[in-house]
Amino acid sequence: EYARTMRVDEVVLALQERRNAMPVADLLRIRTAGVHVNEISTFLERETGRVDLRSVNPSWLIFSDGFSSGRRLSAWAKRAFDMIASGILLIPAAPVIGLTALLVKFDSKGPAFYRQIRVGQYGAPFTIVKLRSMRSDAEIVGEAVWAEKDDPRITRVGRIIRKLRIDELPQAWMVLKGEMSFVGPRPERPEFVDQLATKMPYFAERHVVKPGITGWAQINYPYGASLDDSRHKLEYDLYYAKNYTPFLDILILLQTVRVLLWPDGAR
């Protein structure tokens, strides 16, 4: 009666199902009256564009809709776009990469390109190649170190190419090879993956899609290197992995172009 009087369209259930705790009779009456009944995880996913780790549970991930990126048609369409777009991009990018490589060499000691092992789809390792933007002794102690905002290890040329995202242009070759996609979660180092997987749930599920040059987390969350930052970015990565569509990829690419034109959030 209250739902009808107040013209309620949706009821969001924030309770976990426990014996004698869920008002099943009331919910059934509301649902049969035409009111949509939703639970909190689905509601937050829809309203925030991320999977809320505080409310989600394994059964929700198993039984809710999504995770269609592995279907043959979706995977084929995404791969076809990646191959065509990366092939086209590499043609004008080649002279830019070459010129930038010379500037990197003149600016600081060390190689022009930076190679590093990253974790790809389904946990498979691959070698990522970027134009070097930090000093060659950035990790001289041999331990993986999180990059920081205004990191003092970044060179003069490195600061510019990071702001313009030129350092990431060589990754188009990884996309053409099929190790990466244009859109997907950020590829992390194995050391960081091992560390984060022990501290937050469902971290491995972000690897059901290929890592990307840009992604849903990158355009929705500012750069950060703390554990809390990683948790928030994981929520966006899980949303992308669960809700992938070609339209979502197009939206992310358009937002990435906006960031390139107005690079106020460059790391």
Spans of features found by a protein language model:
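Proline-centered helix-kink/hinge sites
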Residues: Q16, S41, P95, P111, ...
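Extended hydrophobic-aromatic, low-complexity segments
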Residues: T100, P125-I128, E139-E143, L169-W173, ...
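A hydrophobic, helix-centered structural microdomain
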Residues: L73-D137, M174, P246-R267
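A short, structured surface patch at a secondary-structure boundary
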Residues: A147-K210, I252-T256, L260
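Short, glycine-rich, amphipathic interfacial segments at transmembrane boundaries or analogous
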Residues: S41-N57, L61, Y114-R153, T214-E235
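C-terminal terminal-structure detector
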Residues: S68, L73, K177, E191, ...
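N-terminal hydrophobic signal-anchor/signal peptide
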Residues: E1-A94, R267
